[in-house]
Amino acid sequence: MKKITSVLTVFLLLITINVQAQKPRIRILATGGTIAGVSKSATESNYTAGELGIYQLIQAVPQIKDNADISGEQIVKIGSQDMNDNVWLTLAKRINELLNKEGYDGIVITHGTDTMEETAYFLNLTVKSDKPVVLVGAMRPATAMSADGPLNLYNAVQVAADKNSKGRGVMVCLNDAVLSAKDVTKTNTTGVQTFQDPNYGTLGYLHNGKVFFNNIPEKKHTIHSVFDVTRLSQLPKVGIVYNYSNASALPMQAFMQAKFDGIVSAGVGNGNLYKDIFDLAVKAQNQGIQFVRSSRVPTGATTLDAEVDDAKYHFVASQFLNPQKARVLLMLALTQTKDWKKIQEFFNEY
């Protein structure tokens, strides 16, 4: 009888070990943000972002270990208003190592919401794996009475561990929604439903911890992207100028004097430019500073050769990219070429 009991014990132990071994390996990379924020009381709106470390975040949501083998590392501890090129390059290189050399099955990145869409799109163009990479954040600090971070983190891990997440590019997961890095944008300053895709809708959603997909990105990303940051230590300098009635051209002048490599315009309407800015844009393009037209309007495309004769002035139209994402693509495009026609092709394809 003792032998039978011992055999059963060993058998059950082996099953347990096998089940554990079959869990997808998910690495959580922490960068700070509101999801790691701390306030003095549960009802205060004032807080300090990025106070909690990665292990505190993991310990706060033990359920994330139910369906995945979880580990984590701290990349930086900042509010995402301070996100920069160095962190982007660090993230892209580290993610490529983890997925392609260290055998991880997926990545979750905790990140502030202010610039999350920019980081997501940068990684969408520079990660060299079709395994899931999911950015997650929160609109309320961890100490808030009704913090949204814990459930968002749980959901993000569920997405990263889901076999159907493969090949969908980098994703953003908040408020039960799964969104494409290319098309997601922040639409509300404080609401938990802030992240939306106003042009195409969600990639999927979560219900009772289950992931359901209803869409797939069509534009090139990740393993189909030509952009490789492996040997890069810095990125081209690209700025954004804003158009409005009676707009000042001083920002344009400043970027040109500082010898920026490219300039993106947040134009009015269909990417149109105030006259003073337009005149300097023509001059900048003639000086070898690539100029891209985008729009401050939240939906719709900036159309090539509409009211502006882009072919005549060698301007690039951003298509469906908003100004901040157009800046990301232009930075990477300039690592490949300064040919405006080729850069326009990138904007058409990505």
Which positions does each model-derived feature cover?
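Bacterial Sec-dependent N-terminal signal peptides
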Residues: M1-Q22
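ATP/NTP phosphate-donor binding region
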Residues: A21-E97, D279
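Accessory alpha-helical/coil subdomains and C-terminal extensions
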Residues: K23, L29, G53, L57-I64, ...
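A glycine- and small-aliphatic-rich helix-loop capping segment at beta-alpha/alpha-beta transitions
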Residues: A42-E51, T115, Y121-V134, G149-N155, ...
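Short Gly/Thr/Asp-enriched flexible loops that form oxyanion-binding sites at enzyme active sites
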Residues: I109-K131, L273-V282
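Short, acidic/small-residue loops that bind anionic groups at enzyme active sites
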Residues: A120-L151, V157-A161, N286-S295
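Internal gly/pro-rich beta-alpha loop/helix module
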Residues: V136-H207
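C-terminal non-catalytic interaction/assembly regions of soluble proteins
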Residues: N270-Y350
